[in-house]
Amino acid sequence: MNIELKKATADEIPLIQQLSESIWRQHYIDIISKQQIEYMLAKMYSTEKLQQEINSDLHTYFIAYLKDKPLGYIAISKESDNKIMLNKFYLLQEQRFHGLGKKIFELVFSNYPQSDIQLFVNRQNFKSVNFYFKMGFKIADVIDNHFGEGYYMNDFFIVKKTH
């Protein structure tokens, strides 16, 4: 299984949006309300927001491909010389539970071998939480962040130490 992570440019914004809409609407429907899904998609994945993130290097987006077929994407920001934030890690529903997430993580670990990896994951997102635990992440904190319009992100802040 040869997965490739290709750095995304502004040209891939429509693909990131398409993947996001499919993934979020399928995966989060049992975790948060449909209204919150739509609100968060509009806020986080507008063309303007993605252009700002990609063009300013706030986040580095990578699209995961298997045989030239997009499977999902990740977004990483470097917090310090020895810390990265995995801001986004999403796979299409039909691509889950085939070992692809683990392969993508292996690529991330190999690209950032001396960096602790940290991320936020919704506390009710049990499948993802369990996946991260299997990958060696530990809960560092429990966070409730107001996202706007009365919506909250009820997350675990988790970390995988590499050193």
Which ranges hold each PLM region?
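Conserved GNAT acetyl-CoA-binding A-motif
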Residues: F105, N111-N122
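Active-site acidic-Proline motif in GNAT/NAT acetyltransferases
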Residues: L92-E94, H98, R123-Q124
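C-terminal "cap" of GNAT-fold acetyltransferases
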Residues: Q118-V129, F133-M135, V142-H163
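Short glycine-rich hinge loops at helix-strand junctions in the catalytic core
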Residues: G99, G136
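Extreme N-terminal starter segment of soluble prokaryotic enzymes
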Residues: N2-E4
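Acetyl-CoA-dependent GNAT
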Residues: K7-I13, Q18-E94, K102-N111, D144-N145, ...
